[in-house]
Amino acid sequence: ADATFLSMGIPAGLFHRERPEVGIHLNIAIGLMMSRNLCEITGLTLTGYLASRFLQLESGNNSDALNQTKIILRDAEIFCQKIETRFRETAPNLWDTTPKSEHGMLEETIKNLREQWDIGFNDLLSWVCKNASERHKIKITSPAQGYVLTLLPLCLIIVLRKYHGFDSTLTNVLNMGKEADKTGILVGTWAGAIYGWHGIPESWRSGLVNGREIRIRGEGLFSNSFPKKAKDIYEMELGLTLKEFEVGKKYSKKATTFARPTPRPILSWEDEDANKSNIPEKS
């Protein structure tokens, strides 16, 4: 179960946070456009729900952090059940062809994560690899590998295990490498929901190519309305491409010119015909 599409569930999850059933319906439809794998679609939909769920989390209340974490993980288990119920109604034929061993796979993983939560940090990461290896039936050696049952638990651990602040939380997961682009999106979204706009360092918020567009889209998700003044996505991509080109020019290597050496003149005793043989060719 690949984790490539997990972040696609975030917009619908945030936009319909007051109507989670609608969010489930939309995200299952989005998931079915990208995959036929039950775990991938469940993960995509759960990712969107968790983004909206973290908005309700009180980041300053560290004394109650463990209790809040257990509640969130329990809510995630229940939400996985709702996703699979709706999936069964939406795509009954696909549900019937999905092996029974894959039913409830993500729900059971979240449940086991909740039960294992109090063990050491490194032991918990090792458990993530072991659990994913057994369920995906492939050898997994790093929790940052690109599978649903590795990246989702890993990002939950990074975000909820300790309240370090937005910058430290995001830096921690990016430093783990592997699928850093995917974990960065998940942790960045969830940590952003917890710490809010002002929890992001000013130096990170300033200088973004599409900073204004990102902000007004975030405001649009919060207000459940698409901003009319937002640029088309093509314009945003074009602006980013031009910025990358301008930055790249500063660090591009200058072309080096190669000058051919001046050929040495033939000296007086170096007759060009000196090496020609007077022996006649064999006829």
Spell out what each predicted region is:
Residues A1-Y163, T171, L208-S283:
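Phosphate-rich cofactor/ligand-interacting catalytic cores and adjacent structured alpha/beta frameworks
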Residues P143-R205:
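Glycine-rich, charge-dense phosphate/pyrophosphate-binding loop(s)
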